[in-house]
Design a protein with these regions (language model features):
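Polybasic, low-complexity RNA-engagement segments
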Residues: 1-42, 291-478
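Conserved SAM-binding loop of SAM-dependent methyltransferases across substrates and taxa
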Residues: 108-120
Length: 485
């Protein structure tokens, strides 16, 4: 790898000669492969070294073809770079009761799924992505993760100014110059320049200033980048504390994790992951608590009432008008504890959303573009209600409401390619929940001689390649591999 000369000079000055040489050497090595297991869905033993700052993070000995593991598509794990799993450590340290949290720059969903896994029950996660072409993969990954206390939005950071004091926690994994991704992304190396570092720093400050109002006084800001330089890291943390008003907080870490602290003359705590010291990619994180001086922020509900212009005009393409319809009890009973949900019909979709968050959700809908919320139970088609894939993925689905059919590995891959499904002749007609290793993959409608594949078209596996099943099973214990033979 040929590093930009300006990058080498600047990083050498930041790290010193010895650390910089070790970093250069580390960037020539293969990046480690790691996953984070979804313990709410899967209790299968996964082979590998544990990521020390993550309860369910695991390093793999080599990179399997994840695309061809049905359990990957079922949301049993997320392929995530190990350093960024440190967000979990922050939330475990500072969040012990239910919160409303915003992940501002969330796609593709690694930190959102990590946050959702450790947030206390009763917390609401709002995962936002400003880029329209990236928000769908964010929604897909959160749907697969299976938690219903989630809202996915597609908004500019400035839009959140209309929600003052709404969030207890805001995570800003801001767009950056990408120095920490050099060994995984050749484009990041090609596009790097000292000028771009300055552009990124200014963009990051704009994003932070835009969202600051939405963080309640005393709320927690998690600031992170995947870059090394001080301009986007320590200098921005100092700017937040000084200009926006915040205290920098410490996160307990173990010395054997080899996380690097502040590399400037300042003494506030920060957490920098360097590839030659920690097993992961380049990553930087700091935690700040917003000052409470000056009184409470104006409540969001009062703000919206007084600033009606912030609301979307429902007659001009704003929030879709809900149909007046009673959702059948048998559909509500597709969920565990249906009494805990509010049910509504949006277009042709039947959506369930946790009642405890309905007031917050109503406020979000007034100012944000909501892509996904709660769980979509099904779609109205004439007199029929077709169960939605979101229902198959949620951990809130009531077991036993649908007949199940277990698929072989080859059948599961065929289903995920959206190929025709052939079921055993003993299986009755109707909607069938298809499983692999007893984990739900999705629905099919059995019509007798064949079954209509209801897997989402846009999520299908497009490759026709079929690997040796044992190459997939390197993820799991020997018992799991034996099952797959």
């Amino acid at each position: 790898m040929n590093l930009p000369s300006d990058f080498s000079q600047r990083t050498h000055e930041l790290l010193g000669d010895n650390d910089y040489r070790q970093l250069e050497d580390a960037l020539q090595d293969e990046a480690p492969v790691s996953i984070r297991v979804n313990s709410a869905k899967c209790d299968r033993e996964v082979k590998g070294e544990r990521v020390p700052w993550s309860a369910n993070g695991i390093y793999l000995a080599e990179r399997p073809t994840f695309t061809f593991d049905p359990l990957f598509h079922a949301g049993c794990y997320y392929v995530q770079e190990a350093s960024s799993m440190f967000v979990e450590q922050v939330l475990k340290t500072y969040v012990s009761s239910p919160v409303v949290m915003l992940d501002l720059c969330a796609a593709p969903g690694g930190k959102s799924t990590a946050a959702r896994a450790v947030l206390p029950d009763g917390s609401l996660l709002v995962a936002n992505e400003v880029m329209r072409n990236r928000v769908q993969i964010l929604a897909e990954n959160l749907i697969k993760w299976g938690n219903t206390e989630v809202v996915v939005t597609n908004n500019d950071p400035s839009d959140f100014a209309a929600l003052p004091g709404m969030f207890d926690v805001v995570l800003t994994d801001v767009p950056c110059s990408g120095e920490g991704m050099f060994r995984k992304d050749a484009v990041a190396v090609e596009e790097w320049s000292a000028d771009n570092v300055q552009i990124c720093r200014q963009r990051q400050r704009r994003i932070l200033a835009d969202v600051w109002t939405a963080l309640k006084p005393g709320g927690l800001l998690i600031y992170s980048t995947c870059t090394y330089n001080r301009e986007e890291d320590e200098d921005n943390v100092a700017w937040i504390a000084r200009e926006l008003g915040a205290e920098v907080l410490e996160v307990p870490v173990r010395s054997e994790w080899n996380i690097t602290g502040n590399l400037t003359e300042a003494d506030f705590p920060v957490y920098r992951f360097l590839p030659h010291k920690t097993k992961g990619e380049g990553f930087f994180l700091a935690v700040l608590r917003k000052d409470t001086e000056g009184g409470e922020e104006e409540r969001t509900g009062d703000y919206l009432k007084e600033h009606a212009g912030c609301r979307k005009d429902k007659k001009k393409g704003g929030r879709e008008k809900q149909q007046v319809m009673t959702v059948p009890k048998e559909v509500k009973d597709w969920l565990q504890h249906p009494e805990d949900y509010q049910f509504e019909v949006k277009g042709t979709g039947i959506v369930a959303f946790p009642k405890k968050h309905c007031e917050t959700y109503a406020l979000l809908q007034q100012v944000l573009k909501v892509i996904h919320a709660g769980v979509t139970l099904g779609e109205l088609k004439g007199k029929d209600i077709v169960p939605d894939h979101s229902l198959a993925m949620t951990i809130a689905m009531r077991q036993g409401k649908f007949l199940q059919a277990e698929l072989s590995y080859e059948q599961a891959i065929g289903y995920l390619r959206k190929e025709a499904v052939v079921l055993d002749s003993s299986i009755p007609r109707g909607y069938i929940l298809l499983t692999y290793k007893k984990i739900p993959l999705g629905f099919a409608k059995n019509i007798g001689n064949r079954a209509n594949n209801l897997y989402p078209q846009e999520w299908r596996i497009r490759s026709g390649y079929l690997p040796d099943v044992l190459s997939i099973c390197l993820l799991y214990t020997s018992d799991a591999a034996d099952e797959a033979r």
